[in-house]
Swiss-Prot record:
Induction: Expression is not induced in medium containing Tween 40 as the sole source of carbon. Expression is up-regulated during the yeast-to-hyphal transition. Expressed during experimental infection of mice. During host infection, expressed in gastric tissues, but not in infected oral tissues. This is Lipase 9. InterPro entries: AB_hydrolase_fold, Lipase_secreted. GO terms for cellular component: extracellular region. The lineage of its organism: Eukaryota, Fungi, Dikarya, Ascomycota, Saccharomycotina. Residues 1-14 form the signal peptide. The active site is at 194 (charge relay system), 343 (charge relay system), 376 (charge relay system). Keywords: Disulfide bond, Glycoprotein, Hydrolase, Lipid degradation, Lipid metabolism, Secreted, Signal, Virulence. It comes from Candida albicans (strain SC5314 / ATCC MYA-2876).
Length: 453
């Protein structure tokens, strides 16, 4: 009888618990007159409808909000993005970590603002898992800001849209003092891995011209599993167990460029597959397209195969969205790159080329920590303590490297002074699982869970 009751009430219970998906949530819609707002303006805000997720448990933090922010697409057309702001217990209003999660999908319902909420769909599990990477930032007392940088069209791997969204999210956060208590002159570090590195890297490269006023706030950017050439990522993943990434790259670019989409549509052997590319978040794409041949072999999805990249329109679009080709865009803030030599998603050649381009242009500070024994997925874990160490040093006003430094290590667990950050990760993970408060100097009477279940 008990099981029958549970079976009958489960749909009702689930309806109460689950956050609303962006595609049917009116909060994500641009309000009337939004085009007249300035980029970075907060158009509306709310508490996150559900608690921030820790996977199977909610995070115990002080507060969390969603902002609807005025931004723009790759062509300068006005649009809106949603950004999530998380306040830890005993937060430091002078420090912000802008953490770009690796959404790596071309569907609105995969957006970080949705995926970071407790109860979000299992298809967003890869994004949910990144809360364990950002948890130590909260434990240090930093506000964490995470934008839906792909924008309302879900333009995965589209550089300009993504970078501008990150910068406008930071602008909004710095204006949010009356809501969040963040100081207007707060210092900001950007960090992203995989798709999040693409957005963060573009933000750093665009910032001197697009958001020059942020120079007084930005302390640097950490880039892991750094994607700088989208064609190389498609080449590396097509006809492999990671072919879902190739699908999502093509779908994301098609969402921003109608002419790109039209060329793909007219070249397809399997329209049913192409038309469903945007139906999946990353986890689903991996499962759905394992071993898929979009451009390889006889039974490929696109007739032209790799020759499609010789099409002048396609070639220009993919190069316009590859940071490795943008030699005129040079960050003026310190840069930290950590990357596995065995990366299966973003082969290390292109991050190295981007590093060299920036060095040749005279960048003031860039550090490349190459990990000999790890690939894309393992480096996201192994390299994270090195990135955290670098970020803590920047917030502590320690000087970054002068000029360019590329160091190859057996593993980035050998990064200097990394041991304390490794312990920070273990502590934060245990705090998440035990639903302990995330933040510095927490007293026992502050451990009540701030839940929006």
């Amino acid at each position: 009888m008990l099981y029958l009751i549970l079976f009958l009430i489960a749909p009702i219970y689930a309806g109460v618990l689950l956050p609303t998906k962006p595609s049917i949530d009116p909060f994500y819609n641009a309000p009337e007159g939004f085009k007249n707002a300035t980029v970075g303006d907060i158009l509306q805000f709310r508490k996150t409808p559900k608690s921030i997720t820790g996977g199977f448990v909610p995070l115990n933090v002080q507060n969390s909000w969603q902002f609807l922010v005025r931004s723009e697409d790759s062509f300068g057309n006005p649009n809106v993005i949603v950004t999530t702001v998380i306040e830890p217990v005993n937060a430091d209003p002078s420090k912000i970590a802008s953490y770009q999660v690796s959404e790596n999908a071309a569907r609105a319902d995969c957006a970080p603002s949705y995926a970071l909420q407790f109860g979000s769909d299992v298809s967003t599990l890869a994004t949910q898992a990144e809360t364990y990477l950002l948890a130590p930032l909260l434990d240090k007392g930093y506000y964490v800001v995470s934008p839906d940088y792909e924008g309302p069209k879900s333009t995965f791997t589209v550089g300009k849209q993504s970078g501008q969204a990150v910068l406008n999210s930071i602008r909004a956060s710095l204006k949010s003092g009356k809501i969040t208590n963040i100081a207007e002159d707060a210092k900001v570090l950007m960090w992203g891995y995989s798709g999040g590195s693409l957005a963060s890297g573009w933000a750093a490269a665009l910032q001197p011209d697009y958001a020059p006023e942020l120079s007084r706030n930005l302390l640097g950017v950490a880039l892991g599993g750094f994607i700088t050439n989208v064609t190389a990522t498609v080449e590396a993943t097509d006809d492999t167990i990671f072919a879902g990434i190739a699908a999502n790259v093509l779908g994301g670019i098609a969402n921003e460029y109608p002419e790109f989409k039209s060329i793909l549509q007219n070249d397809t052997n399997k329209s049913s597959i192409f038309n469903k590319i945007n139906n999946h978040c990353l986890t689903d794409s991996f499962i759905k397209y394992v071993g898929a041949r979009f451009l390889t072999g006889d039974n490929k999805v696109f007739k032209s195969g790799w020759n499609i990249f010789k099409n002048l329109v396609v070639s220009k679009i993919v190069k316009d969205n590859g940071l490795v080709y943008q030699k005129q865009l040079i960050p003026t803030i310190p840069v930290f790159i950590y990357h596995g030599s065995m990366d299966q998603i973003s082969p290390i050649l292109n991050p190295k080329k981007t590093y060299q381009n920036w060095c040749d242009a005279g960048i003031s500070s860039i550090e490349f920590a190459e990990d000999l024994t790890n690939g894309h997925f393992t480096e996201s874990i192994v390299g994270a303590p090195a990135a955290l160490t670098w970020i803590i040093d920047r917030f502590s006003n320690k000087p970054p490297v002068d000029g360019c430094q590329h160091v190859v290590r057996t593993t980035n667990y050998e990064y200097p002074n990394v041991s304390s950050s490794i312990l920070d990760y273990f502590k934060a993970a245990m705090d998440v699982v035990a639903q302990q408060g995330l933040g510095p100097n927490i007293q026992k009477d502050q451990l009540e869970i701030k839940s929006n279940l």
